[in-house]
Amino acid sequence: MGLEKDLPPGEQLRALFRPFLEQLAASDLSPKTIQKHVDNMWALGGEFIRDLHSDSALRGKPVELVLRQMIEYGGPLLYHGGEDQQRSFDSTCRKFHRFLAKTAR
């Protein structure tokens, strides 16, 4: 499992992810498409925590700020995965970025 110090940023991520995932669940998207987005959000959380481990300076910054910068132009490069998976991941990250921008107003 993860480290104890990963719990607070993980909880903050979950709070940011939840409204987006709830909107997806209430949408007209197919269950398969919704599941792809859910899987991609799980991967985004993992990449976020991985970045915290590789760059400790990120721990001092607000989670939402780091996340927005991470997904501004798509998602970060996936640690594991092929081209198709990266495209799907980038699409979800762009969709999530638009959602965050819209709900911040």
Predicted regions mapped to residue ranges:
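Short terminal alpha-helical segments
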Residues: M1-L29
